[in-house]
Structures are given as structure tokens and as C-alpha cells.
């Protein structure tokens, strides 16, 4: 079952958290669910060059809280936070409510090459530039190894290198335990639009195992970080708190 099911949904409540956190009645649930989809689509389309890994949404009363995990936070924040205001107005326009309070928190991804979505996006960009898929996968594996991941699996399907018959090929480096629930497996699905058609890209990244008592990911054989290492940047928007 671990080979077929979505790794994120399989581990919800164990090592993975829900991307949307809110409660709604049966009448308002469809509307809020559609809002979440519109918000994520708008952000991914507007900031396609910002390397956005994930968009977390939380709702409290009439307040909407967003957490954007990105590889390039400066692209979103802009000069003196002007990008945050532009993003807020765009979200309010997307959901059709100009009075909705929107709080935005931008978090920098600490290890870009260890993030499944960013790796899948990198592979898609290379394939759209007509780079050979085997070379692209090999480069992605090397980047992930330098980032210190314990295992990586990449699968690409479609008309590879312009072949007449579509096929699927995959490769794996290290351990990727799909059946182990305590294993923290980051998963992403991406599409690459090439001149020969659409290629599907799937990436699994194994980062370690979460122990039940400590609730911490402890990579096997990982080198501990130095105390003086650089911390990821975090930009929190508090402009709506006084309103």
C-alpha cells in the first residue's frame, strides 16, 4: 500500500501536518475549500520564480493566515515590505472579499536541495529546456546528496527525449521507506510542458525517522549542525494586528 498511496496523505497526523487548518459547517465548507485552492493557484502563478515550496493556510474567525515557504523570500517581500501589501490585495481580490483580514508570514526554506517540490521544479525547468532527462535526474541526485538527504527517488513519465512511445523511468539513491509511517518522506508531483507533450515528475525525499517520544527527525549518521550556522530568514506580517 505504501507504494501506491500518496506519501503525504498516508502520514497525516503522524509525521505530516495538514496544509489547511480550519473548521467549517457543511454549508460553508465547499466555499472555503474553493478559496484555499484559488489562493494557492494565484500564489504559485504570480510568484512562479520565487521557488515557493508550500502554502499553509489557517483561519481564525474572520482572519486568514498564510505561511509561505520559499527559497527566495526577497522576491515576495519586496522593498520595505511593498510586496506583502501587493500580495494581500491580490488575495483579497481573488477570494472576492476586500474587507477580509489577511496575515502573511514568509519563511525561507532552510535546505533548498532537500525539498521535494523545489527539486521537482528544478527537474521540470531543465526538461523544458530540452536537457536530457537522465542527465537532469543525475544532477538532481547530486544536489540532494550535497544537501545531506538520506534517500531520494525520482520518477519521470511521458515521451522521454521525444520518443514515439511514452514510458516511465525511475531511479533511487539511498533509502526511501514508503511503508514506514514514522519515516519523514517529503513528496511532490510536478508537470513539465515540453514540445513533445507533458511529462510527469514525482520526487520522494527521505529525511529521517521521527521517534515517538522525542517527536524529532533524527537522520541516521547525520552530522550535527554547528551552533554558529546561519538561520533561515523569516518575515512576519503584523500590519493587521493594530487594525
UniProtKB/Swiss-Prot annotation:
Pfam families: KH_2, Ribosomal_S3_C. It comes from the Bacteria. Transmembrane segments: none annotated. Residues 221-243 are annotated as: Disordered. Gene3D superfamilies: 3.30.300.20, Ribosomal protein S3, C-terminal domain. The keyword Transferase does not apply. Residues 233-243 have a biased composition (Basic and acidic residues). Residues 39-110 form the KH type-2 domain. Keywords: Ribonucleoprotein, Ribosomal protein, RNA-binding, rRNA-binding. GO terms for cellular component: cytosolic small ribosomal subunit. GO terms for biological process: translation. The keyword tRNA-binding does not apply. InterPro entries: KH_dom, KH_dom-like_a/b, KH_dom_type_2, KH_sf_prok-type, Ribosomal_S3_C_sf, Ribosomal_uS3_bac-typ, Ribosomal_uS3_C, Ribosomal_uS3_CS. Part of the 30S ribosomal subunit. Forms a tight complex with proteins S10 and S14. Binds the lower part of the 30S subunit head. Binds mRNA in the 70S ribosome, positioning it for translation. PANTHER family: 30S/40S RIBOSOMAL PROTEIN S3, SMALL RIBOSOMAL SUBUNIT PROTEIN US3C. Belongs to the universal ribosomal protein uS3 family. This is Small ribosomal subunit protein uS3. The lineage of its organism: Bacteria, Bacillati, Cyanobacteriota, Cyanophyceae, Synechococcales.
Amino acid at each position: 500500500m505504501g507504494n501506491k498511496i500518496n506519501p503525504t496523505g498516508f502520514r497525516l497526523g503522524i509525521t505530516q501536518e495538514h496544509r489547511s487548518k480550519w473548521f467549517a459547517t457543511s454549508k460553508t465548507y465547499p466555499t472555503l475549500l474553493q478559496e484555499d485552492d484559488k489562493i494557492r493557484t494565484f500564489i504559485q502563478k504570480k510568484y512562479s520564480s520565487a521557488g515557493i515550496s508550500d502554502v499553509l493556510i489557517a483561519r481564525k474567525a474572520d482572519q486568514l493566515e498564510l505561511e509561505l515557504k520559499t527559497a527566495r523570500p526577497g522576491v515576495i517581500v519586496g522593498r520595505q515590505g511593498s510586496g506583502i501589501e501587493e500580495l494581500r490585495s491580490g488575495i483579497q481580490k481573488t477570494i472576492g472579499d476586500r474587507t477580509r483580514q489577511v496575515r502573511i508570514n514568509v519563511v525561507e526554506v532552510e535546505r533548498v536541495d532537500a525539498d521535494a517540490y523545489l527539486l521537482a521544479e528544478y527537474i521540470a525547468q531543465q526538461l523544458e529546456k530540452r536537457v536530457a532527462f537522465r542527465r537532469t535526474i543525475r544532477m538532481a541526485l547530486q544536489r540532494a546528496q550535497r544537501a545531506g538527504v538520506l534517500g531520494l527517488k525520482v520518477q519521470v513519465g511521458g515521451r522521454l527525449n521525444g520518443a514515439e512511445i511514452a514510458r516511465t523511468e525511475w531511479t533511487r539513491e539511498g533509502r526511501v521507506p514508503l511503508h514506514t509511517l514514522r519515516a519523514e518522506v517529503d513528496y511532490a508531483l510536478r508537470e513539465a510542458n515540453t514540445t513533445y507533450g507533458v511529462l510527469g515528475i514525482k520526487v520522494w525525499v527521505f529525511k529521517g525517522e521521527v521517534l515517538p517520544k522525542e517527536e524529532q527527525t533524527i537522520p541516521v549518521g547525520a552530522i550535527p549542525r554547528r551552533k554558529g550556522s546561519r538561520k533561515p530568514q523569516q518575515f512576519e506580517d503584523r500590519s493587521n494586528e493594530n487594525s
